Amino acid sequence: MALKTFNPITPSQRQLVIVDRSALYKGKPVKALTEGLTKSGGRNNLGRITARFIGGGHKRTYRLIDFKRRKFDVEGTVERIEYDPNRTAFIALVNYADGEKAYILAPQRLAAGDKVIASEKAVDVKPGNTMPLQFIPVGSIIHNVEMKPGKGGQIARSAGGYAQLVGRDQGMAILRLNSGEQRLVHGSCLASIGAVSNPDHANINDGKAGRTVWRGKRPHNRGVVMNPVDHPHGGGEGRTSGGRHPVTPWGKPTKGKRTRSNKSTDKMIMRSRHQRKK
């Protein structure tokens, strides 16, 4: 997929850069593989705002994506590649030999007519094929990686994302993630071959604020431009720096304050993503 620019007949089109989706399927999704999606506007069951700056946006239908890929040793044929408004990656509709249909994350270089298969044994190292990490060749580029066997893929699922299998150790696979983190994952966890589709997503430019509103994101206001009743940084005569270390609207330290508690799974992280920055 290429990027698309426009002849600037309006100011917002001057900066606009979007992904050219002309090669994608133009019809509606398979109804049996969709669910309704209700917007919350950032409100909880009491009607109170729990996530600020969310609301509006185009109505969406949720596509049910098969992240688990547990339909073993049944070959599937890719019918088409589709757009999905709920994620940055494209999705692929797969027709299995037994008549079942499913949506999967579309990796790069997967096209209509291609064959894909998932197995608990070693299979061909081709984009879209899924197998346990213990059978994937070291050095392979992978996506949709499970963190617990049977839980479904959690790592490397967004547009252009991938992880690299860099080694094995005592039944564990060593992965290098895009963030620079190296971590251990059990060898029986499934992963799909290839990098996720739509790598050009990183290069888009919305060109105007309204395009962000179409996605359901409302304008984001800084605390220093508010009144004292609305934010600890608010008030003052003229422009101020806030007068204190950065805090949230509820007075808790932010911007660099560490909030992550140590987890038992920290032992799976061999190299932190923060080490790269030093």
Swiss-Prot record:
One of its GO terms (molecular function) is rRNA binding. Residues 202-278 are annotated as: Disordered. Gene3D superfamilies: 2.30.30.30, Nucleic acid-binding proteins (2.40.50.140), Ribosomal protein L2, domain 3 (4.10.950.10). GO terms for biological process: cytoplasmic translation. The keyword Oxidoreductase does not apply. One of its GO terms (cellular component) is large ribosomal subunit. Keywords: Ribonucleoprotein, Ribosomal protein, RNA-binding, rRNA-binding. It comes from the Bacteria. SUPFAM superfamilies: Nucleic acid-binding proteins, Translation proteins SH3-like domain. Disulfide bonds: none annotated. The keyword Chaperone does not apply. Coiled coil: none annotated. InterPro entries: NA-bd_OB-fold, Rib_uL2_dom2, Ribosomal_uL2, Ribosomal_uL2_bac/org-type, Ribosomal_uL2_C, Ribosomal_uL2_CS, Ribosomal_uL2_dom3, Ribosomal_uL2_RNA-bd_dom. Pfam families: Ribosomal_L2, Ribosomal_L2_C. Belongs to the universal ribosomal protein uL2 family. Part of the 50S ribosomal subunit. Forms a bridge to the 30S subunit in the 70S ribosome. One of the primary rRNA binding proteins. Required for association of the 30S and 50S subunits to form the 70S ribosome, for tRNA binding and peptide bond formation. It has been suggested to have peptidyltransferase activity; this is somewhat controversial. Makes several contacts with the 16S rRNA in the 70S ribosome. NCBIfam families: rplB_bact. This is Large ribosomal subunit protein uL2. It comes from Rhizobium leguminosarum bv. trifolii (strain WSM2304). The lineage of its organism: Bacteria, Pseudomonadati, Pseudomonadota, Alphaproteobacteria, Hyphomicrobiales. The gene is rplB.
